[in-house]
Amino acid sequence: MSYTASPCQELVEPCAVHAEGMAQEESHRSQAPPTFYHGASQELDLSTKVYKRESGSPYSVLADSKMSKPHLHETEEQPYFREPRAVSDVHTVKEDRENSDDTEEEEEVSYKREQIIVEVNLNNQTLNVSKGEKGVSSQSKETPVLKTSSEEEEEETEEDATDNSSDYGENGRQKKKEKQVEKVRVTQRRTRRAASVAAATTSPTPRTTRGRRKSAELPKRKKRAAKEPKAPVQKAKCDEKETLTCEKCPRVFNTRWYLEKHMNVTHRRMQICDKCGKKFVLESELSLHQQTDCEKNIQCVSCNKSFKKLWSLHEHIKIVHGYAEKKFACEICEKKFYTMAHVRKHMVAHTKDMPFTCETCGKSFKRSMSLKVHSLQHSGEKPFRCENCDERFQYKYQLRSHMSIHIGHKQFMCQWCGKDFNMKQYFDEHMKTHTGEKPFICEICGKSFTSRPNMKRHRRTHTGEKPYPCDVCGQRFRFSNMLKAHKEKCFRVTSPVNVPPAVQIPLASAPAAPAPAVANTPTSPAPAVSMNPVGSALPSRPVPHPFSHLHIHTHPHHSHHLPIPPVPHLPPPPALFKSEPLNHRSQSEDTFLRHLAEKNSPAQAQHH
C-alpha cells in the first residue's frame, strides 16, 4: 500500500496546486460588486468547489468537470441588479479592507495588468476592463461618474503622455505599470468616498442613487462648460493685437513686430514736430521749424525774404547768396539754370503756344505769371508795399530797388570790388568779370562773352541790325548808347529856348550908313533895318510871336540865340521842325516884317 500511496500523493499535489491557481483566477473573474468590499485575505473553500472525497481515504480524488470552464457560468451574473448592502456592512467591510493592505496591493497589480488591453472608451472615459468580453466590473462603471473635470483632464494628459511615448523598452513598461498602479489607487479611493457618501444619503434602491449621482454631476459639467468661453477672450486678445497704435503718430498695426519696425525706421531716426507733426531728418531743421512757430513764414537771415517751405529757403540761399552753380542746361539753347524746375519753366519759351490771353487788350502770354504781371498795367494795382515807409509799387523789382534806400546799399553787393546791384541778373554778369567766365560764344566769329545780352549785342555787328531809331530825325542806330549820344547832339541844335508869351520888338532908328550886304548863307544873321525914314522910333506894341524859337536882334554883332532865362516850373516844349528848315523860315520872317514896316511908315508920317 505504501508503494501505491506515494504515486497517488504525487498526483494529488500538482492537481491541488493547479486547483488553487484556477480558484484564484475564478475569484478574479467572477468577483461580483458586493464581493469587492470583502477582505482579500479570505481563504477559499476548495473542499466543496474544487474536489470531493468519495470514501474515507484521503487519497481518493474526484476532479470536478465544471472547473475547466468557469467563465461560461459567470456571464449570467448581473451585478447591477443585486440588492445593496446595509450601511453597517459597508463600514465593517471598509475596516476589513484597511487591515489587509498587502493582499490588496497584490490584487491591484494583477488586476491592472489585465486592464492594459482597453483603457479609453469612445467617450474618452477611463474604464477598468478585464480580459473577458463582459468582464467589466461595476466599480469601473461607477468611477467615471464621480470624476471631476479637472481630474479627468489630468488623467487625459497622463494617458496622452503614455500613448505618445515611443520608448517601448523595459524602463517604459515599468513606468507605465507604476502609473497604472497609481491610477487604480486613485480610482479606489474615489469609489470609497462615493460609497460612503451614497450610503449615508441615498435610498435602498440602487437606481435612485444612480439618478442622484447623475443629477449631482450636472453642475460639474456646467463648470466645464463655463470654461469653454475661452475663445472670445482669445478673440479679444487678437483684437487688442490688431489695434496696436503708435504713440507718436496715428498709424495702427496688427502685430507688435510691425510696430517696433515702424518705431525704429520712422520715429527713432526722424525728428517730428510736436505741434504740427512735420518730420525732419536733422535736429537743426526741427529747431529752425520751431522758431517759426510752425505757421509763420521762414525768412532768410541775409535778405529777410520769406518762404513757406524749408527747401525753398535752401534753394534761395544757394542761388541768391552765391555758392550754387548752374548745372542744368537747356537742350535747345544750352542756357544753364540752378535747378531742373527752372529748366522746365524755361522750356515754355521754346514753344509756340500762348494759352494765356489778356481779357482787356487781347495780348497772349506763355506763362500765367506773365499775364498776371501784365494785368497790373490795366488795373493800376500796386501790390508790393514797402514795410518801412508804406510806399507801394507795381512791380517787384521796383520794390527791390527802393529797399536800397533803407538798407544803405543795394541788395546784391560784390565782395571783390564793393559794387552793388539791384537785380540778380546784373550781379551775376558782374561776377563773371572777376572769375573770367565767358560761357556765351558767338556762332559767327567765335568770340565769347560773359552774358547773353552782350552776345546778342555783338551779333548785330555781323547782321547789320539797327533796332534803335531816333524819334526826331528817324535815324537808326545799332546800340542804345549811340542813340543816346545822337539825341544829345540833335536836341542841342534844335533845343528850344523859352520866351515870354508877349515879346516887345523895338524898331530903333539906325545911323545913316550903307546897310551891309545880307549874306546868302542860311546861318548868317539879318542886319537891323530902319523902319522909320525920319528916324523916330515906333511906339512899342505887343506882338505875339508864332514861333518860340525865332528871335530878331537889332545889333549885327549879336549871336542868333540870346541867353534868356527859362520860365520856371514849366518843361521845355518839344521841337516842331528840323534845324535847316527853321533857318530858312527865319529869313522869310525877316522879309515879312520889313514889308509890314514899309506899309505902316506913310500912315505914321501923315499922323505927325
UniProtKB/Swiss-Prot annotation:
<feature type="compositionally biased region" description="Basic and acidic residues">
    <location>
        <begin position="71"/>
        <end position="97"/>
    </location>
</feature>
<feature type="compositionally biased region" description="Basic residues">
    <location>
        <begin position="548"/>
        <end position="561"/>
    </location>
</feature>
<feature type="modified residue" description="Phosphoserine">
    <location>
        <position position="57"/>
    </location>
</feature>
<feature type="region of interest" description="Disordered">
    <location>
        <begin position="540"/>
        <end position="589"/>
    </location>
</feature>
<comment type="similarity">
    <text>Belongs to the krueppel C2H2-type zinc-finger protein family.</text>
</comment>
<feature type="zinc finger region" description="C2H2-type 3">
    <location>
        <begin position="298"/>
        <end position="321"/>
    </location>
</feature>
<keyword id="KW-0479">Metal-binding</keyword>
<keyword id="KW-0678">Repressor</keyword>
<keyword id="KW-0805">Transcription regulation</keyword>
<keyword id="KW-0677">Repeat</keyword>
<keyword id="KW-0804">Transcription</keyword>
<feature type="modified residue" description="Phosphoserine">
    <location>
        <position position="196"/>
    </location>
</feature>
<keyword id="KW-0862">Zinc</keyword>
<feature type="region of interest" description="Mediates interaction with CBFA2T3">
    <location>
        <begin position="497"/>
        <end position="608"/>
    </location>
</feature>
<dbReference type="GO" id="GO:0000978">
    <property type="term" value="F:RNA polymerase II cis-regulatory region sequence-specific DNA binding"/>
</dbReference>
<dbReference type="GO" id="GO:0003700">
    <property type="term" value="F:DNA-binding transcription factor activity"/>
</dbReference>
<feature type="region of interest" description="Disordered">
    <location>
        <begin position="60"/>
        <end position="234"/>
    </location>
</feature>
<dbReference type="InterPro" id="IPR013087">
    <property type="entry name" value="Znf_C2H2_type"/>
</dbReference>
<keyword id="KW-0597">Phosphoprotein</keyword>
<protein>
    <recommendedName>
        <fullName>Zinc finger protein 652</fullName>
    </recommendedName>
</protein>
<keyword id="KW-0238">DNA-binding</keyword>
<keyword id="KW-0863">Zinc-finger</keyword>
<feature type="zinc finger region" description="C2H2-type 8">
    <location>
        <begin position="440"/>
        <end position="462"/>
    </location>
</feature>
<feature type="modified residue" description="Phosphoserine">
    <location>
        <position position="100"/>
    </location>
</feature>
<feature type="zinc finger region" description="C2H2-type 5">
    <location>
        <begin position="356"/>
        <end position="378"/>
    </location>
</feature>
<feature type="zinc finger region" description="C2H2-type 4">
    <location>
        <begin position="328"/>
        <end position="350"/>
    </location>
</feature>
<feature type="compositionally biased region" description="Low complexity">
    <location>
        <begin position="194"/>
        <end position="208"/>
    </location>
</feature>
<feature type="compositionally biased region" description="Pro residues">
    <location>
        <begin position="563"/>
        <end position="575"/>
    </location>
</feature>
<feature type="zinc finger region" description="C2H2-type 6">
    <location>
        <begin position="384"/>
        <end position="406"/>
    </location>
</feature>
<dbReference type="Pfam" id="PF00096">
    <property type="entry name" value="zf-C2H2"/>
</dbReference>
<feature type="zinc finger region" description="C2H2-type 7">
    <location>
        <begin position="412"/>
        <end position="434"/>
    </location>
</feature>
<feature type="zinc finger region" description="C2H2-type 2; degenerate">
    <location>
        <begin position="271"/>
        <end position="293"/>
    </location>
</feature>
<feature type="compositionally biased region" description="Acidic residues">
    <location>
        <begin position="98"/>
        <end position="108"/>
    </location>
</feature>
<keyword id="KW-0539">Nucleus</keyword>
<comment type="subunit">
    <text>Interacts with CBFA2T3.</text>
</comment>
<comment type="function">
    <text>Functions as a transcriptional repressor.</text>
</comment>
<feature type="zinc finger region" description="C2H2-type 1">
    <location>
        <begin position="244"/>
        <end position="267"/>
    </location>
</feature>
<feature type="modified residue" description="Phosphoserine">
    <location>
        <position position="203"/>
    </location>
</feature>
<feature type="compositionally biased region" description="Acidic residues">
    <location>
        <begin position="151"/>
        <end position="162"/>
    </location>
</feature>
<dbReference type="GO" id="GO:0005634">
    <property type="term" value="C:nucleus"/>
</dbReference>
<feature type="zinc finger region" description="C2H2-type 9; degenerate">
    <location>
        <begin position="468"/>
        <end position="491"/>
    </location>
</feature>
<dbReference type="GO" id="GO:0008270">
    <property type="term" value="F:zinc ion binding"/>
</dbReference>
